[in-house]
Amino acid sequence: LALAYAIAHPERVTGLVLRGIFLGTRPEVDWFLYDMGRFFPEAYKEFVEYLARDDREDILMSYHDKLTNDQTLVHQPAAERWASYETSCSTLRAGARRVTGRSALSMARLEAHYFANDCFMPPDHIISNIRVIRHLPAHIIQGRHDVICPPVTAHRLAEAWGRNATLRLVDDA
């Protein structure tokens, strides 16, 4: 969101410090929904097997439908599966971490809503418009082992930004 804001209002921004780079692209969303589980197969299995077999073809819309359902007995378990999957994949320590209650619901609904709406940006919006903020200093900090936001995205952003961007990869993160 910081990047989208800076591109929309460059006159209000003096620089950016960014971490865990996510550009809101369809490949990044697909990575989260379909490919990230290669590194966390147990968490992915729980995430996907919660859905009926027929609903697994379009994981995003299946979860989105459940998460936006008014009935707590429908949206809350879906939210907890979504949030637990994400938090399980966000650590170097193996093992599922349960996220429950309003925290799970807030995280899952917000992310699914953004993902279902292409993060409210045209394809590749950030990189295509980086010229608007290229003059600003940017410090990009990225975990080398970040599975949710892989370092390749931070590299792509730093290269597109040019000389005013510094990229620091943190080896143990």
Regions found by a protein language model. Give the residues of each.
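Small-residue-rich helix-loop
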Residues: 97-104
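Catalytic histidine neighborhood in serine/cysteine hydrolases
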Residues: 151-173
